[in-house]
Amino acid sequence: MTEQSAHEKYEFKKKLEGLRDKKGRSTELISLYIPPDKQIFDVTNQLKDEHGQAANIKSKLTRTNVQGAIESLLSRLRYLDKVPENGIVYFTGAVDIGANKTSMESEVIVPPDPITVYKYHCDSSFYLEPLEDMLKDKNTYGLLVLDRREATIGLLVGKRIQPFRNLTSTVPGKQRKGGQSAHRFQQLRLIAIHDFYKRIGDAASEVFMAVDHKDLKGVLIGGPSPTKEEFHAGEFLHHELMKKILGLFDTAYTDESGLSELVNAAGEKLQDLELMGQKNAVRDFFKELIADSGKVAYGESQVRANLEINSVDVLLLSEDLRAERVTTKCSVCGYENKWTRRWKPGEPAPAAGNCPKCGSSLEVTDVTDIVDEFSELADKSNAKVVFVSTDFDEGSQLMNAFGGIAAILRYNTGV
């Protein structure tokens, strides 16, 4: 995924959650993926063909809904002068809203990563897999496994291992040939080992340096002892890559299977690195909490109050937080109320209820996502926002014990 703020990633994830929960009847939901190099004229022609074919659908209701969705897409495409550089995705169709009713709904997404394949898809649910893949971790790590006879170079991109190079050596075994002195043989062997290490270093540097320096998070080296230690001590990698070495790990294999073995051996280290910033922020919060310094706030009302007086230094929001601030108003007597509800994708809109003063029906006048509201307040006061995963104990505790909302303050406010 291209560089996104944590809040943009949250918004993208939330939007996909909402789409995932929408269901239609038969094949009434259309997903249209348009890559950046696709001509709009070609897309329009295919949609017109699909509209004609939809006339053959036996069910009148399904036929009407599918053709209506295609007409909606054609109408939108008329206003699209150029496909965005990452492509564009349209979702439209008759969504089941219960009580044997449907609602024609549409959503447009410009993805954070480029779309590579054109796709027109009709089903009872929206086709989301390519967009969901963009949410997956795309951090890149250099992988190198070696001994004195073989080396394999690869990359770990997200969760996928990509082998790049395999090298073999001409380093002689420990038994010398007849006619050579032991000293001479040992000298030749050490030269051959050094030359092989240099070949490995040059090849690995070429592969790893081709990765954008912002994406390459580190280098992992595996193999038997003392080979990997010798290679590391000899500084055969480019000097910029030497700074990125995260650790040396024991592996039995130095072929492609050795790359998988290396990733497994370094699994805990990789997970710690990915979560380190989050862990440090949450631990700082607990440290201040235990010290009773008064420089923490938690829960929606406390944190909101401190955000409003610009006293928040670090805002902690759980990645699993789903909450809305709902405003209801009585049009008869003017009574107004604000309240918060936790929500899950696909749940119905909050019931407004009746006015406690005059008994008239209340209407929902505003619904604001808590994450949007708090992120905007934090932005205004230059507070750092950290989205916290529940994949580690402290992150889970933040969600379960503190409602997914906490803050480290710049000073004790007493609020």
Curated annotation (Swiss-Prot):
Sorted UniProt keywords: Cytoplasm, Protein biosynthesis
SUPFAM superfamilies linked to this entry: L30e-like, N-terminal domain of eukaryotic peptide chain release factor subunit 1, ERF1, Translational machinery components
Signal peptide positions (record): none
Lineage top rank: taxon: Archaea
GO MF: translation release factor activity, codon specific
Gene Ontology annotations for the cellular component aspect, listed alphabetically: cytoplasm
Subcellular location: Cytoplasm
Segments traversing the membrane: none
InterPro entries reported in the protein's UniProt record: eFR1_2_sf, eRF1_1_Pelota, eRF1_1_sf, eRF1_2, eRF1_3, Peptide_chain-rel_aRF1, Peptide_chain-rel_eRF1/aRF1, Ribosomal_eL30-like_sf
Protein family: Belongs to the eukaryotic release factor 1 family.
Subunit structure: Heterodimer of two subunits, one of which binds GTP.
Protein task: Directs the termination of nascent peptide synthesis (translation) in response to the termination codons UAA, UAG and UGA.
Name listed for the protein in its UniProt record: Peptide chain release factor subunit 1
